[in-house]
């Protein structure tokens, strides 16, 4: 039977780049791998065909020869097998085999000899106030976590016994499986890659080598942390398997919304209401700071509502620095309500005394309105 075109086998056009070829090969190899299609002779044929096509097209030199001469380029002993199976090709297959059955092609796994493995990392979510983020704090937390069994010292074996070498893999932790022109390795199902089995498990941990306990830790929260800050505590995660190193603990901080301040980086923003008289004549207004003190803010004469006044260095500390952000006070001019008759009379009298100098914005606005309507009237004439 004549060989199919390699590009047709992989479902790619002749201009496909290496990324497209690799993605297509991976998809087809996953579909037709014999381990996913046991007892299916067609799957074995298709898998070999796919492997051969990719081995040629992934290599620029072989691809060039194929594009020029077709399958004839590899006749008379010049076939695509043999040395063409390089590390990159093996890496691609290894990724596929990991997806298929959690094995590998000679690659080292997370477990070392004897089944030792690093413990899992843990995550702890902590809510803090803006004041605590400003000053920093020492927090005490309790977390349920796996620790090394104190009875068997993490071995998982009953006192006076030792784990035995796994008979299935002879202590290798992996089983070799011949497939075509290469050899696969998969994790031993009997010992789960440890190379040893426990015949007499520790009664305290049931052979796991670890037990769950509640641990209390002191966590130092530095001043200036922001919402979403992550703090890593090395070695405070779950205990390792069979004496492996422990994982880490990650503290994720969430800062609660504040009733008075809003934060942007190291700067703080707040609003302060003032009277019309204070806005017109000037004065001072007292506002709180994030540190708990009160400070007086000078209101310049003629201050308009919405104006922001800056207090240098009154914001949040910058993390791992001696500098501070600023605090911005936005002035909100209150319109008086529930006025007495006399107050209304005085305001009316003031309005009568007003001029373009006292209300430049208003007068400018009405002047523009007048010009607008006059211009519109002229256009209609």
From Swiss-Prot:
Ligand binding (Zn(2+) 1): 149, 152, 202, 205
Keywords, comma-separated and alphabetical: Chaperone, Cytoplasm, DNA replication, Metal-binding, Repeat, Stress response, Zinc, Zinc-finger
**Where's it found, cell-wise?**
Cytoplasm
| Each CXXCXGXG motif repeat, start to end | 149-156, 166-173, 188-195, 202-209
What molecular function terms (GO) are annotated for this protein? ATP binding; heat shock protein binding; unfolded protein binding; zinc ion binding
Pfam families to which the protein is assigned, alphabetical:
DnaJ, DnaJ_C, DnaJ_CXXCXGXG
Task: Kindly list the ranges of residues that form CR-type zinc fingers according to the record.
Answer: 136-214
> What does the cofactor section's free text say about binding?
Binds 2 Zn(2+) ions per monomer.
Q: Locate the residues binding Zn(2+) 2.
A: 166, 169, 188, 191
Please tell me one Gene Ontology term that the record gives under cellular component: cytoplasm
Q: Which CDD domains match?
A: DnaJ (cd06257), DnaJ_C (cd10747), DnaJ_zf (cd10719)
Biological processes annotated in GO: chaperone cofactor-dependent protein refolding; DNA replication; protein refolding; response to heat
* Required cofactor(s): Zn(2+)
Domain spans labelled J: 5-70
Q: What does this protein do?
A: Participates actively in the response to hyperosmotic and heat shock by preventing the aggregation of stress-denatured proteins and by disaggregating proteins, also in an autonomous, DnaK-independent fashion. Unfolded proteins bind initially to DnaJ; upon interaction with the DnaJ-bound protein, DnaK hydrolyzes its bound ATP, resulting in the formation of a stable complex. GrpE releases ADP from DnaK; ATP binding to DnaK triggers the release of the substrate protein, thus completing the reaction cycle.
Q: Which family does it belong to?
A: Belongs to the DnaJ family.
Comment text on domains = The J domain is necessary and sufficient to stimulate DnaK ATPase activity. Zinc center 1 plays an important role in the autonomous, DnaK-independent chaperone activity of DnaJ. Zinc center 2 is essential for interaction with DnaK and for DnaJ activity.
Q: Which HAMAP family match?
A: DnaJ
- Which PANTHER family does the record cross-reference, listed alphabetically? CHAPERONE PROTEIN DNAJ, DNAJ HOMOLOG 1, MITOCHONDRIAL-RELATED
Q: How does it assemble?
A: Homodimer.
Please state what the protein is called.
Answer: Chaperone protein DnaJ
Source species? Azorhizobium caulinodans (strain ATCC 43989 / DSM 5975 / JCM 20966 / LMG 6465 / NBRC 14845 / NCIMB 13405 / ORS 571)
Q: Which gene encodes it?
A: dnaJ
